[in-house]
Design a protein with these regions (language model features):
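Small/polar-residue-rich segments within soluble enzyme cores
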Residues: 47-54, 68-175, 492, 511
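Ligand-recognition elements built from short beta-strands and adjacent flexible loops
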Residues: 446, 460, 492-683
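Juxtamembrane extramembrane loops of integral membrane proteins
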Residues: 3-56
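Conserved, well-ordered alpha-helix/loop/beta-strand core segments that scaffold catalytic motifs
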Residues: 164-207
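Conserved SxxK-family serine transpeptidase/carboxypeptidase catalytic domain
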Residues: 81-95, 101-118, 122, 393, ...
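Second-shell loop/turn segments in exported
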Residues: 27-41, 49-52, 73-82, 105, ...
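Beta-lactam-recognizing serine transpeptidase/beta-lactamase-like catalytic domain environment
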Residues: 16, 158-167, 207, 212-252, ...
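Soluble non-cytosolic domains of exported or imported proteins
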Residues: 2, 39-46, 82-86, 132, ...
Length: 683
């Protein structure tokens, strides 16, 4: 069987790879020991069961029951007796149990567990052939590349089994190709932690967050809830669709930005010109502003800041309904971006009657995907050029050095001019930063954030109108930073919060957006300081395995990296990041020494740092919370063994206490219940 290709992040960190694991088997038939000086079958079933239970997750009684089967020569232990690690193998071998053996088998290993799971996907073993086959995500999309090809041995032999001379033809297996993604593991950690916090706080039905490079279209991080753990298989199959591009939804007022851009391009938007807010009666349905009564006659610019529904309907009238639809199409809605490889949903521009046309102006009736929204939004920061989002950097074979695919920045179209893009961005700035902003809860101290909030009613799954309940909303925010020259776009959305629903309604997704954006900007060294080093060169990790400890420390430090030694020895036997990988300056490189294992001071470490420690030392670490390490159960310098378990607690340095007294902190389309109730009746 060929080795399956690996999946890497943008910095060369392994996200999925093959590892050798072991399956536990037991010979229980006495006949196996015939003519043997040493027993080859299980002799003491009770003692064997007792010892094995300390390694595999089975009770001694359950193991003993299996060992006591009649008429069986050899038995296995089900799923609990498979996927055993090398450390498990060593522990069992030290027990010297007669009749017990471990068979090697290849398994797919996902070192980070629940981590960009719907993007990376999962490979599963065919129970009949033993082959790994991609079942979801990149593992499935690029399965033909990752799988490689089998080897073979052909020859001619006679009836006695003798091989004829010069007939043997051997074909070596071809190793699978590697897939390199655009995601950054560090930013992915920020996303995973933020979403975990949102689930704990709000218990939503659906939740997602995505980070995109505003200047290249590269997806730097993406995750969703519910999700699954590809390493353990927990919750796998609970939700198959990748919400980034396979599920559509009505976006709400984040969609207003594209109608605004069309109106500016057509000369219909005059920021100082006043219009009448409040409500409109369309086809027997009353469509109101989110506060039901509007604000009287107000300037168009203030109407956009307030996220007025009547403003967007007014602009549609000025542009013309059919022409407005064509503008949405220019922004890429109603069709696939053709950049996501498999099963991308096109969405639909709802335009069959006047009611749909008018409600589409504020993001109802029309359906989209997050990747379409990101593509359209990118036009505002690239002189009117839309960038196609992409998440695969390359597909290449490490043996042959042949490259089969290379991702690159692609312009998907130019719907608007540079001047229009700049004018839209100015309005996005006012939405968040003006004195009359209703989105102040998305501001981040020291960073210049701009963007657009969204609140939409959620379509009922059976197609009958909209979901009912105390908080039947999809809340979202599409934001970028720093303004005028954004580095990243962060888009987060949450549907149907079941807990703290009033807070979810008022604060939207700010408790996810803010830590993701702030941590990402800090990580990329942009924002607060005037020196933008976001384009700084990556540091290449040196090869220090086998070196003297002090020499290794000096060599790592010379690359502007932070060496952290683990152990009491004087020589380095392993390092957490492979030599040659490129990482951002000041990244931690863990160096495992010979001698006794000792506990490092993990204060301030990220989850990724702790996971790297776990992978390097094979010591189990239980993680609790999110942010940075604030407590560890074993003190610094204490000796460790592989039997130890370490509890590590995290807390965020970005505790969000910046709540606002503004009752409409996320209220761009709040209380549209009047208009939506009427619309439900008319649909």
């Amino acid at each position: 069987q060929p080795e399956r290709g690996k999946i890497y992040d943008r910095n060369g960190k392994v996200l999925a790879e093959d590892v050798e694991r072991y399956k536990l088997v037991a010979v229980i038939d006495k006949k196996a020991s015939a003519n043997s000086k040493k027993p080859r079958h299980v002799v003491d079933k009770k003692e064997t069961a007792k010892k094995l239970s300390t390694v595999i997750n089975m009770k001694p009684e359950e193991i003993e029951k299996r060992l006591s089967q009649k008429k069986a020569f050899q038995i296995e232990f089900g799923r609990k007796g498979t996927n055993l690690t090398y450390q498990d193998k060593l522990k069992i071998e030290k027990m010297n149990l007669p009749g017990i053996s471990l068979l090697p088998e290849t398994e797919r290993f996902y070192p980070n567990g629940n981590f960009a799971s719907h993007l990376i996907g999962r490979a599963q073993k065919n129970p009949d052939t033993g082959e790994l086959k991609g079942a979801l995500g990149v593992e499935k999309i690029f399965d033909s590349y990752l799988s490689g090809s089998k080897g073979s041995l052909r020859y001619i032999h006679d009836i006695w089994g003798y091989i004829a001379p010069n007939t043997k033809k051997e074909k070596q297996p071809k190793r699978g190709d590697d897939v390199h993604l655009t995601i950054d593991s560090n930013i992915q950690v920020f996303v995973e932690e933020a979403l975990d916090g949102m689930v704990e706080r709000y218990q939503p039905k659906d939740l997602f967050a995505v980070v995109m490079d505003a200047k290249t279209g590269e997806i730097l991080a993406y995750s969703q809830r519910p999700t699954f753990n590809p390493e353990t298989g927990k919750d796998f199959g609970k939700k198959w669709a990748n919400d980034l591009y396979q599920n559509t939804y009505e976006p709400g007022s984040t969609f207003k930005s594209y109608g605004l851009a069309a109106a500016i391009q057509e000369g219909a938007f005059d920021p100082d010109k006043k219009y009448k807010s409040g409500h409109r009666d369309i086809m027997g349905s009353r469509i109101s502003d989110w506060n039901r009564v509007g604000w009287g006659e107000i300037p168009m610019s203030l109407g956009f800041t307030y996220s007025s529904n009547t403003l967007m309907m007014h602009l549609q009238d000025l542009v013309g309904a059919d022409k407005m639809k064509s503008w949405y199409e220019r922004f890429g809605f109603g069709k696939s971006t053709k950049g996501m490889f498999d099963g991308e949903a096109p969405g639909q521009i709802g335009w069959s009657n006047e009611l749909q046309q008018k409600t589409s102006s504020f993001g109802q009736s029309t359906t989209v995907t997050p990747v379409q929204m990101l593509q359209a939004q990118s036009a505002f920061f690239n002189d009117g050029n839309m960038l196609k989002p992409w998440f695969v950097n390359s597909v290449e074979n490490p043996v042959s050095k042949r490259q089969f695919y290379k991702g690159q920045k692609q312009i998907a179209g130019k719907p608007i001019t540079k001047d229009t893009a700049e004018k839209v961005e100015k309005q996005l700035d006012l939405v968040v930063n003006s004195k009359k902003s209703h989105a102040a809860n998305y501001r981040i101290d020291g960073y210049e954030v701009e963007g657009k909030t969204g609140t939409a009613q959620v379509a009922a799954p059976n197609g009958g109108g909209y979901v009912k309940g105390p908080n039947p909303y999809f809340v979202s925010f599409m934001g970028d930073a720093p303004k005028k020259n954004p580095k990243v776009i962060v888009y987060a959305g949450m549907s149907l919060a079941q807990k703290n629903d009033q807070e979810a309604y008022e604060l939207g997704v700010s408790k996810a957006f803010k830590p993701i954006m702030e941590n990402t900007l800090k990580y990329l060294n942009v924002g607060k300081s005037k020196d933008d080093t976001s384009n700084a060169e990556y540091s290449k990790v040196p090869d220090v395995e086998g070196q003297d400890k002090q020499k290794a420390i000096d060599n790592v430090s010379a690359k502007s990296l932070e060496p952290v030694t683990i152990g009491s020895g004087t020589q380095i036997k392993a390092q957490s990041i492979k030599a040659g990988n490129k990482v951002l300056p000041h990244s931690k490189v863990l160096l495992l020494t010979d001698g006794d294992l000792t506990m490092p001071d993990m204060s301030g470490w990220t989850k990724e740092d702790v996971i790297a420690f776990e992978n390097l030392t094979n010591i189990k670490v239980n993680l609790k919370g999110s942010g940075f390490v604030s407590h560890q159960s074993i003190s610094k310098g204490q000796k460790l063994t592989e039997k130890d378990k370490i509890d590590v607690e995290f807390s965020s340095e970005n505790v969000d206490s910046n709540s606002t007294n503004n009752s409409d902190s996320n209220s761009d389309d709040k209380k549209k219940s009047d208009s939506k109730t009427d619309k439900d009746k008319s649909d």
